[in-house]
From Swiss-Prot:
Region annotated Disordered, chain positions: 1-35
Composition bias, Low complexity: 26-35
Sites where a glycan is attached: 15, 27
Extracellular side: 1-61, 154-156
Residues where Phosphothreonine is found: 114
Underlying gene: SLC31A1
Protein family: Belongs to the copper transporter (Ctr) (TC 1.A.56) family. SLC31A subfamily.
The name this protein goes by in its record: High affinity copper uptake protein 1
Subcellular location: Cell membrane; Early endosome membrane; Recycling endosome membrane; Apical cell membrane
Length: 190
């Protein structure tokens, strides 16, 4: 049976058994597509601790030494802390920019000579206001950072996963201690 259309991926039939493999999780397999050569990185499906040939978000950003992994750990840790701080900053800005709602009551004559109180609610927030535009930009930044952190965690590299979790925990500890909101309205990926 011809499996050339599977782009270098190997498959087993129902009679074969899988042998344990000690290949590095990012071993590349070359394949041809439409006459052009390209390389495909095999994504690990289990957690591992290593620093050789670890791609971090972009194909040109490859970790190969312990020093590079230490630098990546610090950068990812700080990014996760920044994410938590950004969530709290957005909540604070939202609370400050919310227009207080005023209720005006006035007596209105009702049927049979009764007097009713008519209440008007005044809200002054607009879609094209500076606070709303700022919240929109900060929301975009927060979403992008949350996806970056998710993709970093999905490398299954133990060091990078620890950096994400430790950075998020430290950021929460540092920035959320005054947080009075029980429901987190700006949560994206937890």
């Amino acid at each position: 049976m011809d499996h050339s259309h599977h782009m270098g991926m190997s498959y087993m039939d129902s009679n074969s058994t899988m042998q344990p493999s000690h290949h590095h999780p990012t071993t590349s397999a070359s394949h041809s597509r439409g006459g052009g050569d390209s390389s495909m990185m095999m994504m690990p499906m289990t957690f591992y601790f290593g620093f050789k040939n670890v791609e971090l978000l972009f194909s040109g950003l490859v970790i190969n030494t312990a020093g590079e992994m230490a630098g990546a750990f610090v950068a990812v840790f700080l990014l996760a802390m920044f994410y938590e701080g950004l969530k709290i900053a957005r909540e604070s800005l939202l609370r400050k920019s919310q227009v207080s709602i005023r209720y005006n009551s006035m007596p209105v004559p009702g049927p049979n000579g009764t007097i009713l109180m008519e209440t008007h609610k005044t809200v002054g927030q607009q879609m094209l206001s500076f606070p709303h535009l700022l919240q929109t930009v900060l929301h975009i930044i927060q979403v992008v950072i949350s996806y970056f952190l998710m993709l970093i965690f999905m490398t299954y590299n133990g060091y990078l996963c620890i950096a994400v979790a430790a950075g998020a925990g430290t950021g929460y500890f540092l920035f959320s201690w005054k947080k009075a909101v029980v429901v987190d309205i700006t949560e994206h990926c937890h």
